[in-house]
């Protein structure tokens, strides 16, 4: 079996005005959709970053895959490594929120984008679900958490109508957002994206959530935007309210000091983003939970390696998310299904994406009782909707965004806004 066609299609979909440590989401999120077709007629799908630096590498890699055996992942990795070495990519804007955007992650980013499509193609050719290539499913329902954000009611100079979620800047609005998430999707845990407003106010929102949803596990994620002293002060206010404390302060050393001084379980998707950082983190006891993300950890199988290392060193495992669509979510679900030590519900932005902006046939994947169910069909169990793909590609061409920049977008609201880390 040989590869005869590789297509990389950049797309854009509407993204709400969600606040974060760097600024605010732009009106559109960018992704790439990858299709790989074999000479036997099977097609594998992948979804990855759609910013210009990532796309440039993906486009260069795809031209070298024609004639390759889709089972030869070592050859794929060698092609990606050589391409990145020759390309010397620049970092993608917004990198602090998406550690996979760092130029140093270019190999793992690009390899993952194609590895998922290769594995999907392999599984189709064998007539088995993709998870069977990862050792089989330990679970077929993957738990996710309600992912809350502070947000404005609409984008400044919005190119489309406001989303249905409305403003969320105070305790009452955040509780209402959580209630809608839980009522609609059945989530059993809650995560609040923080680092955007005054820390005491964000902690007050956690307190309001605890009162409104007693017994529901809570997490807060300031994206490293609190100083060590602020993080300690907020830890004292939070007490035992949290399931885990995610990336409150920057750096491996800062996180290690915070854990020493508070004893709270710390989680990260920012200070442990590759295996070298993992080694250093273990030596320092910086974090107790690692949020995996196959998009920048080097694919589904490297994510399994990460989970095994976490098991070896007694660390918990969860999963990180960026704005994504169904191919990414289902790939995430398949690898999560194969990981024995998935200790916590995973993150997903999926509820924030509009129902008419999915690229797979059948529309958005259902989230029921807080879980995504593995599709027991060949590969990922998904097919592209060509009309929807064309629509979102046209939106990419017209939206004017080529590289995520939450700082620049925030400056449209606050002209004096600057990158400051930690801000509080």
Where are these regions (language model features)?
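Short, acidic/polar
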Residues: 156, 160, 164-182, 231, ...
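Glycine-rich, aromatic-flanked loop segments that form ligand/cofactor-binding clefts
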Residues: 109, 116-156, 324
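Short, Gly/Pro- and small/polar-rich lid/capping loops
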Residues: 1-32
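Flexible C-terminal active-site loop/helix
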Residues: 1-13, 39, 305-306, 324-424
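Active-site mouth loops of central-metabolism enzymes
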Residues: 142-175, 194-196, 223-224, 267
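Conserved, mostly hydrophobic/aromatic
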Residues: 3, 41, 114, 127, ...
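Metal- or metallocofactor-binding catalytic centers and their adjacent structured scaffolds
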Residues: 37-125, 415-418, 422-424
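Catalytic core of soluble alpha/beta enzymes
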Residues: 192-328
